[in-house]
């Protein structure tokens, strides 16, 4: 059976380090500040925002929440972002996605100052990531890389197969693996013979949002499996993008769902906010 990569335990360790760093800054009169902007009443978004608020409080980061009505105009949101860009108490800005349809998401993300882009989605930060000189790295893929490092996985020379090419996870994590000298294959909906691609991987990173799409039988014996997917099946069951039980029988290490990558995402958001405050 595979070793379980415990995201909760790794996140707790990193948060302990963040708490200590925040306390050091506080002794110098600096409190890292994160502004979280929520537009509308999306239930999942409200849950995520409250989790981020609690996480900030737990490590000593100042959290400023802006909850705007669903009918907020694009111009009103851009004005708020401009104000937050100029606010010296704020070191990180996060706009919770998805946004209502009357607001252009791309325009909003581009309006955030690259130096306060705690989510790492600004084109400037994406470009820096691609050339190997990152300022902010997107939180979920960053969390994946930290998990691999903490598990003792050296990517140099390894075959890494990333399934899913989203701008939020798939593409950035592929570039991050490339910078660690892995040989990366990025698979997507038009990829031919996905099973054969996955079967050659030393490390599989699944981020497609399709319940148990990647079959356990595809996994090479001894491979490491990182499952970013969180999919609801029925009323209460959560599953990943990988067939967990069958994959566990073949993999050397695997992340569970829930309790794997999820806890790392908010942890890396806290880390990005801390790093921004240290740069000031």
From Swiss-Prot:
Keywords: Amino-acid biosynthesis, Histidine biosynthesis, Hydrolase, Methionine biosynthesis, Multifunctional enzyme, NADP, One-carbon metabolism, Oxidoreductase, Purine biosynthesis. It catalyses: (6R)-5,10-methylene-5,6,7,8-tetrahydrofolate + NADP(+) = (6R)-5,10-methenyltetrahydrofolate + NADPH; (6R)-5,10-methenyltetrahydrofolate + H2O = (6R)-10-formyltetrahydrofolate + H(+). Disulfide bonds: none annotated. InterPro entries: Aminoacid_DH-like_N_sf, NAD(P)-bd_dom_sf, THF_DH/CycHdrlase, THF_DH/CycHdrlase_cat_dom, THF_DH/CycHdrlase_CS, THF_DH/CycHdrlase_NAD-bd_dom. Pathway: One-carbon metabolism; tetrahydrofolate interconversion. CDD domains: NAD_bind_m-THF_DH_Cyclohyd. One of its GO terms (cellular component) is cytosol. NADP(+) binds at residues 164-166, 189, 230. Belongs to the tetrahydrofolate dehydrogenase/cyclohydrolase family. Homodimer. Catalyzes the oxidation of 5,10-methylenetetrahydrofolate to 5,10-methenyltetrahydrofolate and then the hydrolysis of 5,10-methenyltetrahydrofolate to 10-formyltetrahydrofolate. This is Bifunctional protein FolD. The lineage of its organism: Bacteria, Pseudomonadati, Thermodesulfobacteriota, Desulfuromonadia, Geobacterales. The gene is folD.
């Amino acid at each position: 059976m595979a070793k379980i990569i415990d995201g909760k335990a790794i996140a707790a360790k990193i948060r302990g380090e963040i708490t200590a760093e925040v306390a050091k800054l506080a002794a110098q009169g600096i409190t890292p500040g994160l502004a979280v902007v929520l537009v509308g009443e999306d239930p999942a978004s409200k849950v995520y925002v409250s989790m981020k608020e609690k996480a900030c409080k737990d490590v000593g980061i100042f959290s400023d929440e802006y909850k705007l009505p669903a009918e907020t105009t694009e111009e009103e949101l851009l004005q708020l972002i401009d104000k937050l860009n100029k606010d010296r108490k704020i070191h990180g800005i996060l706009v919770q996605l998805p946004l209502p349809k009357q607001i252009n998401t791309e325009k909003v993300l581009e309006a955030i100052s690259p130096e306060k882009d705690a989510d790492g989605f600004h084109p400037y930060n994406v470009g820096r990531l691609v050339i190997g000189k990152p300022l902010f790295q997107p939180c979920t893929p960053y969390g994946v890389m930290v998990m691999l490092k903490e598990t003792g996985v050296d990517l140099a020379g390894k075959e890494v197969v990333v399934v899913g090419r989203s701008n939020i996870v798939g593409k950035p994590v592929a570039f991050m693996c490339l910078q660690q000298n892995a040989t990366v294959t990025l698979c997507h909906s038009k990829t031919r013979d996905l099973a054969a691609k996955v079967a050659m991987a030393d490390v599989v990173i699944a981020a497609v949002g399709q319940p148990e799409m990647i079959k356990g039988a595809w996994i090479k014996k001894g491979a490491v499996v990182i499952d970013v997917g969180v999919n609801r099946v029925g009323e209460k069951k959560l599953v990943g993008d990988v067939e967990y039980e069958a994959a566990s029988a073949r993999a050397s290490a695997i992340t569970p769902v829930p309790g794997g990558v999820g806890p790392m995402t908010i942890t890396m958001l806290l880390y990005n906010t801390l790093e921004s405050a240290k740069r000031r």
